[in-house]
A protein has these predicted regions:
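Active-site hotspot residues in diverse enzymes, especially metal/ion-binding acidic/histidine motifs
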Residues: 1-324
Length: 324
């Protein structure tokens, strides 16, 4: 088997360039990406000599997809197959899974002969497998949601679940995948929180919000995951499954170290199918601790100055000279 020479992002960018050129000449919808067509044409396009077959089957709900070599044990005779779970109801998840397996084919097929991908398996992957799975996800996200195009879809300063949902529809992916991609490039301080039964399962932050997500992902001293605050809108309005535009909440409800008076915007969608709640938090620009201290000092100075003026006026009114 010929070893690929580039990583997940360069491979995705190469395919993106080819797709842009194809649609510029032949027209048709650029998005969502027809991943099945791309998979079938990739071996010929890049002359790998290792064809890929695709087959969907109804399988266990936890299984998502797999890539394996039908000629295992025969070097340089790769004949690959991708199997995906046809029982998954979300076409966006299926599209992402297929792109993920294509990423394994392009980036990792020289490293091993089979890739079995399911969320449950993550608990048992070693560091090498985790790295490869992360790279396959990265490839899929760049292929399906090119950042330069994504930026053009999010031009308003106000971002909500309607805006991001429109991007999910454009790219034919799940809302979760669309939000995670947005977090990669947004300058906003934002965190996506996935919870189940009021307990944080995981959190992912933007570049400026990564420390906030780290705080939510950190387990308690007893080893348990953190509960959502009882004062969060997600808990207070648990009966309402959707809040696409957001409710203003004191930032300290979620992040106690944030300054007093700061409010964040909390949006959420409850998925009955997956028995979990997705909450998106968007915060104002960070106020550094030393900036808070300076602000407090300025407030104190203002108070002292005003107090001094009041005392001086009082003395004058009382016929006394002001203190100099």
């Amino acid at each position: 088997m010929t070893a690929p020479t580039t990583g997940p992002v360069p491979w995705a960018n190469r395919l993106t360039k080819l797709l842009n050129q194809f649609h510029a000449v032949h027209g048709g919808d650029r998005f969502p990406v027809d991943v099945e067509m791309l998979i079938r044409q990739t071996p010929e396009q890049f002359q790998t000599g290792e064809p890929i077959a695709i087959q969907g089957q109804a399988m266990d709900p936890e299984f998502e997809g797999a890539l394996f070599n039908l000629n295992a044990g025969q070097p340089d005779k790769g004949n690959w197959a991708i199997i995906y779970n046809q029982a998954i109801s979300s076409l966006g998840r299926i599209r992402f899974t297929l792109a993920h397996e294509l990423g394994h084919y392009l980036v990792h097929r020289h490293l091993q002969e089979s890739f079995n991908c399911s969320e449950a398996d993550m608990l048992h992957w070693d560091s090498t497998e985790r790295k490869m799975e992360g790279e396959a996800d990265l490839f899929a996200s760049y292929l399906l949601m090119p950042i330069d195009d994504y930026r053009k879809q999010v031009t308003s300063n106000t971002v909500d679940l309607d805006v991001l949902g429109g991007c999910a529809d454009r790219y034919g992916v799940s809302l979760t995948a669309a939000i995670l991609k947005w977090l990669e490039f947004t300058p906003k301080r934002a965190v996506l929180v996935m919870s189940r039964n009021g307990v944080v399962q995981w959190a992912c932050g933007s570049e400026s919000g990564k420390w906030l997500s780290i705080a939510l992902n950190k387990k308690l001293p007893n080893g348990q995951r953190r509960n959502l605050s009882e004062q969060s809108a997600t808990v207070l309005h648990a009966g309402a499954n959707v809040d696409r535009y957001g409710t203003e909440v004191d930032a300290r409800v979620w992040f106690p170290s944030e300054p007093a008076g700061m409010a964040l915007r909390e949006m959420r969608i409850v998925s009955d199918q997956y028995r979990q709640t997705m909450t998106l938090l968007i915060l104002p620009q960070e106020i550094k601790p030393w900036e808070r201290d300076q602000s407090d000092e300025d407030d104190a100075d203002d108070t002292d100055d005003n107090g001094g003026l009041e005392n001086a006026f009082d003395r004058i009114l009382n016929g006394q000279p002001p203190v100099r």
